[in-house]
From Swiss-Prot:
It comes from the Bacteria. GO terms for biological process: DNA repair; DNA-templated DNA replication. Keywords: DNA damage, DNA repair, DNA replication, DNA-binding, DNA-directed DNA polymerase, Nucleotidyltransferase, Transferase. The lineage of its organism: Bacteria, Pseudomonadati, Aquificota, Aquificia, Aquificales. Its EC number is 2.7.7.7. This is DNA polymerase I.
């Protein structure tokens, strides 16, 4: 194995001289604690293992990496370490992200090498002592090998990505990421560029009003205990005991509750939702809601660091391409709790979300003429749907009828049953309708929005004949589905994920052009939260909205994209 171990400034200068003609470099790091020990870097012919413990002046290395593209595996990890040294590459290609896009089940470097190159890597030195004063030859060889492997993997994975289908996004072929790595797949271009954004999102963290969090947690815990005591005094049953609760509800209140697979009476939320009008059920559901809020507040408190939380984001957290977050999860914060997130002194949040984006994507994906026309005319889709299925003028639609239309739209584009619609309307939107009413509304929806019925029928037919449905989002993200629900969800939600990520990339590029400092602090499916100085907020809002609408024009060719924004020092829309 050919590589050079670099331990001094002269050796570093020589290495950089040989590497500086390459538009992209292969990179990996070995770390210990919060420091980088080794930076392994190479081009098509040369591999260097650079020991940062031995080199004082790393400015030449910083300049080399910052001006180039980097190929690596799980690059978010390396980028967060490099950032501490003032190093951040201008473009990224991540073989782990490529593995997700190509549909592999396992994404470690070893698994990818085994799949594509046909051999196994020796990972026994991964957890060795990288802080040792003298590194062994075996450690150095292990470190160098990761770069050598990346050199073999990159062209194979790039060529496979370039075969992904795409209906949209040809504008992205002109971007820096596309040119540096010779990428032709729009969705791959977006995901590779987005690696940098996820690293920055984790570095930035999300600011919290610590006093508000502490007070809210105490208040919620007090209220929870009060409700539990009230329940016990009234019914002499512990509301947190499934066994005691099941006995109370079935024997005293004669509720016909379903059984679990083990034959026990089920008292989970789903089983109880049909009986919300029964007093003990109502109380139990309130207690559970309070407990969930308390648990979430505790989770946030556990992860506080310098007045912020620093979640881990998984760039592709689902088949759809949607992100997920953990430690803490800040994508499932209840609206009542969002006010505990507060921008730092002198700063504010710019909060922007895509308006009715799932419906807009669905209308374009299935090419429904009625829905397309309504969006082109700038109609409020929920009000419009209510008027269509209820046979009323749009201006006569009540607030409750519009709520019902939300359940109809978001439920029926995905083909839920009449029973499912009645439950969804009650649970999700607080509107009660009978099974018969749900059936009539369902029939009227599909009679008017015919393309959705035709799409659902095609999906069912393909599932019956082939056992699976294969397809891709409008930007070319592949998916394979074995159930009807997945087959209709994946292309819509996947296109939504593509759209959000592209919007963030355009926003970052536009910020850099203007030289404005603003931090991305959270992303939730169709919402972008940015922290910036109060004086810059209006300008940042304008740039963010423009970026989101431009992303919309790239992915959605027929439906206009609308964006709703607020400027607030707390993460609330009020």
């Amino acid at each position: 194995m050919d590589f050079e171990y670099v331990t001094g400034e002269e050796g570093l200068k020589k290495a950089i001289k040989r590497l500086e003609n390459s538009p992209y470099l292969y990179l990996d790091t070995e770390t210990t604690g919060d420091r980088i020990r080794l930076v392994q870097i190479g081009d098509e012919e040369n591999t260097y293992v650079i020991d940062l413990y031995e080199i004082q002046d790393i400015e030449p290395l910083r300049k080399l990496i910052n001006e180039r593209g980097i190929v690596g595996h799980n690059l978010k990890f390396d980028l967060k370490y490099l950032y501490r040294y003032g190093i951040f590459p201008s473009a990224t290609f991540d073989t782990m992200i490529a593995s997700y896009l190509l549909g592999y089940e396992r994404h470690s470097l070893n698994h990818i090498v085994s799949n594509l190159l046909g051999y196994s890597m020796d990972k026994s030195y991964q957890t060795s002592d990288w802080g040792a004063s003298v590194l062994s030859d075996a450690q150095l060889k292990y470190a160098a090998n990761d770069v050598i492997v990346l050199r073999e993997l990159f062209p194979k994975m790039r060529d496979m990505l370039n075969e992904l289908d795409a209906e949209r996004g040809e504008e992205l072929l002109k971007t820096r990421t596309a040119k540096i790595f010779d990428l032709k797949s729009p969705v791959a271009i977006v995901e590779m560029a987005f690696v940098r954004e996820v690293a920055k999102l984790e570095i930035n963290g999300f600011p919290v009003d610590v006093e508000e969090l502490t007070n809210k947690l105490k208040a919620v815990e007090r209220e929870t205990q009060k409700r539990i005591q009230e329940f016990y005094i009234k019914y002499r049953v512990d509301p947190l005991s499934p066994k005691q609760l099941a006995s109370l509800l079935t024997k005293k209140f004669k509720l016909n509750l379903p059984k679990t697979p083990k034959g026990n009476v089920s008292t989970d939320d789903k089983a109880l939702t049909s009986y919300q009008d029964v007093e003990p059920v109502k109380l139990v559901l309130e207690i559970r809601k309070l407990k969930k809020i308390a648990d979430k507040l505790k989770e946030l408190k556990e992860h506080l660091k310098n007045g912020r939380v620093y979640p881990e984001f998984k760039q592709i957290g689902a088949v759809t391409g949607r992100m997920s977050s953990a430690h803490p999860n800040i994508q499932n914060i209840h609206r009542d709790m969002r006010g505990i997130f507060k921008a730092e002194e002198g700063n504010t949040f710019v909060i922007s979300d895509f308006s009715q984006i799932e419906l807009r994507i669905a209308a374009e994906y299935v090419k429904d003429p009625l829905m397309l026309d309504a969006f082109k005319k700038g109609k409020d889709m929920h009000r419009y749907t209510a008027s269509v299925v209820l046979g009323k003028k749009e201006e006569e639609i009540t607030k409750e009828e519009r709520q019902l239309a939300k359940a109809i739209n978001f439920g029926l584009i995905y083909g839920i049953s009449a029973k499912g619609l009645a439950e969804y309307a009650k649970l999700g939107y607080g509107v009660e309708i009978s099974l018969e009413e749900a059936q009539v509304l369902r029939e009227r929806f599909f009679k008017n929005f015919k393309a959705f019925k035709e799409w659902h029928d095609r999906v069912k037919k393909e599932l019956k004949e082939k056992g699976e449905v294969k397809g891709h989002t409008l930007l070319g993200r592949r998916f394979s589905a074995n159930t009807f629900n997945d087959a209709v969800n994946y292309p819509i939600q996947g296109t939504g994920a593509d759209l959000l990520k592209l919007a963030v990339l355009l926003f970052d590029a536009n910020l850099q052009k203007k030289g404005i400092d603003a931090k991305l602090v959270n992303l939730v499916h169709d919402e972008i939260v940015v922290e910036c100085e109060k004086e810059k907020a209006e300008e940042v809002k304008e740039i963010l909205e423009k970026s989101m609408k431009t992303a919309g024009k790239i992915i959605l060719k027929e439906v206009p994209v609308e964006v709703e924004s607020v400027i607030n020092e707390r993460w609330t829309k009020d």
